[in-house]
């Protein structure tokens, strides 16, 4: 009888543990859902304010300000969300650092192929002594 009650308690404990885990992880908590809703509202407000700021001057934005004052107070009351909020900044698709990493030899190859007068150079075996001042090849010497 002792072994049966022990297994009964173990299965009961595992069942309660699974229910508690599902309740904590799967079921949304009202505080989390309200913080998500607040985050969505803040994002919409930020988009609206950026559109209004782009279309009108700062003085006009101050006239429109009282209609947004109640939303401004809500930002201070925001609960802790799941992560740090990243500001929306317009960035180029290719990072600026990539320009430093990419090595475009177009300017160098053009400088090697043509001289100051636009004449084509046909080789670099002899160095600069191979060409005269006008870009023509020297033979001999």
Swiss-Prot record:
GO MF term list: neuropeptide hormone activity; neuropeptide receptor binding
Keywords of this entry: Amidation, Cleavage on pair of basic residues, Hormone, Neuropeptide, Secreted, Signal, Sulfation
PROSITE patterns: GASTRIN (PS00259)
Signal in keyword set: yes
InterPro entries according to UniProt: Gastrin/cholecystokinin_CS, Sulfakinin
Sites of Sulfotyrosine modification: 117, 134
Biological process according to GO: adult feeding behavior; adult locomotory behavior; inter-male aggressive behavior; larval locomotory behavior; multicellular organismal response to stress; neuromuscular junction development; neuropeptide signaling pathway; positive regulation of cytosolic calcium ion concentration
GO CC list: extracellular region
Signal peptide feature range: 1-31
Propiece residue ranges: 32-73, 86-111
Localization, UniProt: Secreted
Modified residues (Phenylalanine amide): 82, 122, 139
Function: Drosulfakinin-0 (DSK 0) plays diverse biological roles including regulating gut muscle contraction in adults but not in larvae.
Similarity-based family: Belongs to the gastrin/cholecystokinin family.
Name of the molecule in the record: Drosulfakinins
């Amino acid at each position: 009888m002792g072994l049966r009650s022990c297994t009964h308690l173990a299965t009961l404990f595992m069942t309660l543990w699974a229910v508690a885990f599902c309740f904590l992880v799967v079921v949304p908590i009202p505080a989390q859902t309200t913080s998500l809703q607040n985050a969505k509202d803040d994002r919409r407000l930020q988009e609206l304010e950026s559109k209004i700021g782009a279309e009108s001057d700062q003085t006009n934005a101050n006239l429109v300000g009282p209609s947004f004052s109640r939303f401004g107070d809500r930002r201070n009351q925001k609960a802790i969300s799941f992560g740090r909020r990243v500001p929306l900044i317009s960035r180029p698709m290719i990072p600026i650092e990539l320009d430093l990493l990419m090595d475009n030899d177009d300017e160098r190859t053009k400088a090697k192929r043509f001289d100051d007068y636009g004449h084509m150079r046909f080789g670099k075996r002899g160095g600069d002594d191979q060409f005269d001042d006008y870009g023509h090849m020297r033979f001999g010497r």
